[in-house]
């Protein structure tokens, strides 16, 4: 059987953190995940998915995620039940996370969720937008590989049998 869940969403509130009597760290949080389609009014609805994570990942979630943080989770769906204070049976379905990925810088939430304009400007520099005075050895050496292409001077169709193709 297959039980796998992969979600990307934003935390609806700060994670709740506790330690079990046996010393295991536990963090619970709710992810708001947008649906891929719109409703009759043209708005996207969201699902609110309960998640739980244990041990070191729980410590990291507690230390680095907060309300509004963008996170990706990978885990499995699990159902459990318990009896509440009124004596009623309560059923809970949640994602038990094997992995939680932090999908934005920690300081992104300090600006109300808005990125500063220059926050990511340096990321494009390695892809041809070299600034003056910057020594980028990747750009200098990447163009020398063109002569290694065995088909660079081919003038017609390539003669290859179907038996030589890997598919």
From Swiss-Prot:
<keyword id="KW-0227">DNA damage</keyword>
<feature type="domain" description="SSB">
    <location>
        <begin position="1"/>
        <end position="104"/>
    </location>
</feature>
<keyword id="KW-0238">DNA-binding</keyword>
<feature type="compositionally biased region" description="Low complexity">
    <location>
        <begin position="132"/>
        <end position="147"/>
    </location>
</feature>
<comment type="subunit">
    <text>Homotetramer.</text>
</comment>
<dbReference type="InterPro" id="IPR011344">
    <property type="entry name" value="ssDNA-bd"/>
</dbReference>
<dbReference type="GO" id="GO:0006260">
    <property type="term" value="P:DNA replication"/>
</dbReference>
<feature type="short sequence motif" description="Important for interaction with partner proteins">
    <location>
        <begin position="162"/>
        <end position="167"/>
    </location>
</feature>
<keyword id="KW-0234">DNA repair</keyword>
<dbReference type="Pfam" id="PF00436">
    <property type="entry name" value="SSB"/>
</dbReference>
<dbReference type="GO" id="GO:0009295">
    <property type="term" value="C:nucleoid"/>
</dbReference>
<keyword id="KW-0233">DNA recombination</keyword>
<dbReference type="GO" id="GO:0006310">
    <property type="term" value="P:DNA recombination"/>
</dbReference>
<feature type="compositionally biased region" description="Low complexity">
    <location>
        <begin position="109"/>
        <end position="118"/>
    </location>
</feature>
<protein>
    <recommendedName>
        <fullName>Single-stranded DNA-binding protein 1</fullName>
    </recommendedName>
</protein>
<feature type="region of interest" description="Disordered">
    <location>
        <begin position="107"/>
        <end position="167"/>
    </location>
</feature>
<comment type="function">
    <text>Plays an important role in DNA replication, recombination and repair. Binds to ssDNA and to an array of partner proteins to recruit them to their sites of action during DNA metabolism.</text>
</comment>
<dbReference type="InterPro" id="IPR012340">
    <property type="entry name" value="NA-bd_OB-fold"/>
</dbReference>
<dbReference type="GO" id="GO:0006281">
    <property type="term" value="P:DNA repair"/>
</dbReference>
<dbReference type="InterPro" id="IPR000424">
    <property type="entry name" value="Primosome_PriB/ssb"/>
</dbReference>
<dbReference type="GO" id="GO:0003697">
    <property type="term" value="F:single-stranded DNA binding"/>
</dbReference>
<keyword id="KW-0235">DNA replication</keyword>
């Amino acid at each position: 059987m297959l039980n796998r869940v992969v979600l990307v969403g934003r935390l609806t509130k700060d994670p709740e953190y506790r330690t079990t009597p046996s010393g295991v760290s536990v963090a619970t949080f709710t992810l708001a995940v947008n649906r891929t389609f719109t409703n009759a009014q043209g708005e996207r609805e969201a699902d609110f998915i309960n998640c739980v994570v244990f041990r070191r990942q729980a410590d990291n979630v507690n230390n680095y995620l907060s309300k509004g943080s963008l996170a990706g989770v990978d885990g499995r769906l699990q159902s459990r039940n318990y009896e509440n204070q009124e004596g009623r049976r309560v059923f809970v379905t949640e994602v038990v996370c094997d992995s939680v990925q932090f999908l934005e810088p920690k300081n992104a939430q300090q600006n109300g969720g808005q990125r500063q304009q220059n926050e990511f400007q340096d990321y494009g520099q390695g892809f041809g937008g070299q600034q003056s005075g910057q020594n980028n050895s990747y750009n200098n050496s990447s163009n020398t590989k063109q002569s290694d292409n065995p088909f660079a001077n081919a003038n017609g169709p390539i003669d290859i049998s179907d038996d030589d193709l890997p598919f």
